[in-house]
């Protein structure tokens, strides 16, 4: 590999999940030996109202998720679930359940299917 990243962030424009890279299950690519894979620093981006890799209304939550995910020791006091619920209540007037918050931060593999087909 020309690059050896410390962290890999997977967008929702792909069906790939962290375990696909960690278990080297992606066709045509060998992820073994990469620093991020060895450290298990492979993460799927959240999926709120839109794919969070691009600027969207969910961008503040994406940045908070990135900070907490990449620097957990510095953001240990941040309750991401509570912040997400507060954000959705303030911005949209919507009260999210724990299950809805979980789906934002652990999007299903199928969430990337439409985007993967569009390429």
PLM feature spans:
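Binding-cleft/active-site segments that stabilize strongly anionic ligands or cofactors
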Residues: 1-60, 69, 74-76, 81-86, ...
